[in-house]
Amino acid sequence: MMKSIKDRSFRPVDVAVAPDGSIFISDWYDPIIGGLAQRDISRGRLYRIAPKGSRYGQPKLDYGSAKECVNALKNPNYCVRYKAWNALHKMGSKAEKELMKMFLSKNLRHRARALWLMGKIEGRSAHFVDMASKDQDPNIRILALRLARQTGTPLIKVIEKMTSDPSAKVRRECAISLTHVRGDKKASLWASLAINHDAGDRWSLEALGIAAENDWDSCLSSWLKLVGDDWDTDKGKDIIWRSRAKESSLLIAKILKDPKVPEKDRPRYFRALDFQDAAQREEALIKILE
């Protein structure tokens, strides 16, 4: 990170990585702080950050073969990567062998770039989504879900295999993916994800909330069938607090009437009633007063 203590005119406004790996920073460099003199129109500075003694040079880049394009796809400069990506995409299945070598490397960013391209090869999307969904790295498994959404690969089959994934962030991505799903299977998949929610994980909770939008009644009902009387746990209360189903208000009322609920937690449940349907909220408030 660059900053200047003495030079008050130093105002870095943009940064870019050059094809040789050096970093360029553009400095607005307004010599007058405040006022309308507009002296910045004809002023400015560029800084290059690189190892000591390193001279700027334009690396030799070629996009004629899959091997050369894959090498360019690893470049830190996004313009180089853009040209490489488009060239590889046009090659289609002819580039698959070289892309697979890149995918099998240890560099996570390189693996992700290769997977995005392989997933766009005509007729191969489902294969690479399936392959990525079984990967040891949770970031690649997340990418499998995003690739499925972008390529139109049936999401239900992908999510079904991943609802019990050991990684919370993969399960969150499953929930986000469910937002795009309609039909009978959605509620049961949502319930499976909700069962695996970790109490206190707000990111997980919000992902589940986004997934259930417009389908709260069926989603919550399916979850309640799975948990039965065991809904009254810390993670179960999380789900109820975030839910917007017809049953939610009365369940919140049960939580509020429970003497074991700490006093410090009660305001959040009362606040949760504000997000429920008015008629059901009134019914719940009457229950609380009884």
Go through the PLM ranges and name each one.
Residues 1-7:
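Blade-edge beta-strand/turn elements of extracellular beta-propeller
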Residues 28-41:
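Short, conserved, GDST-rich strand-edge loop motifs in beta-rich repeat architectures
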Residues 2, 32-34, 194:
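Active-site rim elements
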Residues 17-19:
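Residue-level detector of Asp-centered blade-edge/turn motifs that repeat once per structural unit
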Residues 26, 42, 49-290:
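Long, ordered, helix-rich scaffold segments
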